[in-house]
């Protein structure tokens, strides 16, 4: 069960420092274990390597920002997570099967529609 606590500590550290240049050594040092041990138990417990996990979390969190932060360029958001614009676009497309620009466009349209639909539904609920 101690391994679960180590993994939880590592994951919490990753989420808290996701916009930094993370590496296994830094995470292992924070957890108080060797990088070899941490790498082994992380993969065994999660089924994913630490680097794969970090990459996935960065792409998923940055996608939320691409959707919400309409006033910022996609390149700026990519840089926040340590990616060049072209590298970011490639990783983003691998993960979501669409470019960041397509994702932003589709999600901004659906978010606006959902917002108004949600408000209408809420008002109807309160009126009943």
Spans of features found by a protein language model:
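Terminal helix-turn-helix DNA-binding modules in bacterial transcription factors
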Residues: 8-25, 44-81, 107-127
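Core residues of bacterial helix-turn-helix
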Residues: 31-32, 81
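Short alpha-helical segments used as structural interaction elements across diverse proteins
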Residues: 32, 37, 52-55, 101
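Short coil/turn motifs that cap or connect alpha-helices
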Residues: 34, 49, 73, 84, ...
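Short hydrophobic/aromatic patch on the recognition helix
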Residues: 38, 42, 87-88, 92
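Gly/Ala-rich beta-loop-alpha elbow adjacent to hydrolase catalytic centers
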Residues: 82, 93
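Long, mid-chain structured domain cores
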Residues: 86-91, 98-102, 106
């Amino acid at each position: 069960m101690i391994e679960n606590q180590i993994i939880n500590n590592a994951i919490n550290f990753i989420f808290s420092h996701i916009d930094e240049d993370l590496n296994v050594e830094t995470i292992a040092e924070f957890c108080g274990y060797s990088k070899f041990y941490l790498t082994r138990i992380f993969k065994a417990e999660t089924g994913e390597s630490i680097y794969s996990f970090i990459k996935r979390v960065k792409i998923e969190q940055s996608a939320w920002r691409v959707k919400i932060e309409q006033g910022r360029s996609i390149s700026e958001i990519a840089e926040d997570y340590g990616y060049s614009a072209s590298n970011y676009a490639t990783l983003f497309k691998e993960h979501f099967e669409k470019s960041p620009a397509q994702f932003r466009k589709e999600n901004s349209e659906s978010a606006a529609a959902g917002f108004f639909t949600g408000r209408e539904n809420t008002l109807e609920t309160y009126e009943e």
